[in-house]
Regions:
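Formylglycine-dependent sulfatase
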Residues: 2-4, 8-10, 20-182
């Protein structure tokens, strides 16, 4: 092979190698907000004329706005289990809402979205209501969440209402979630 042909093939090889290489993209940030007792058109971004939700509207405008979706069940524990596992609640054996000191909770053998995110080097946190069991083996920090601050089920929130010296639990949950979001990835 002569020198000219070698140069020609070298240039073609370099173009081919660099042209075919895929640039490494940064993983997207994921912020998932789940609200209780919210109907389809309760947010102004979905048509409500009664409730103003400017911050959620802005998030919907800049992110993903879902218009066709299905709630697996209309109760807390079952719905949360479905969202975190991708399974029907009945397949998980969850058909209602867990109460305080329940012997039941999310099966430790189920693979949760939080665990899949951890496997892909995401920093995970949950701030608010868990409602998937309050025994140690059911806690969110044992299911792929790095941080948790909130309530374990619904029935415990009323004893804190209306006042606590350190403020409303919702305000503290919001504050801690904002700190979590703003911290750099580990």
């Amino acid at each position: 092979m002569n020198n000219k042909t070698l140069k020609y093939f070298s240039v073609i090889l370099i173009i081919f190698l660099f042209g075919c290489s895929k640039s490494i993209e940064k993983s997207p940030n994921i912020v998932f907000i789940l609200t209780d007792d919210l109907a389809y058109a309760d947010l102004s971004s979905y048509g409500s004329e009664f409730i103003e939700t400017p911050n959620l509207d802005k998030m919907a405008e800049e992110g993903v706005k879902m218009t066709s979706y299905y709630a697996a069940q209309a109760v807390c524990s079952a719905s949360r289990a479905a969202i975190l596992t991708g399974c029907y609640p009945n397949r998980l054996g969850i058909s209602g809402a867990f109460g305080p000191k329940s012997k039941r909770g999310i099966n430790p053998d189920e693979l949760l979205l939080s665990e899949m995110l951890k496997e892909n080097n995401y920093k995970t946190g949950i701030f608010g209501k868990w409602h998937l069991g309050d025994a140690e083996k059911f806690l969110p920090t044992n299911h792929g969440f790095d941080e948790f601050y909130g309530i374990l089920f619904s029935n415990d929130m009323w004893k804190f209402h209306p006042e606590r010296p350190e403020g409303y639990p919702d305000d503290l949950m919001l504050y801690l979630s904002l700190i979590h979001i703003s911290e750099p990835t580990r």
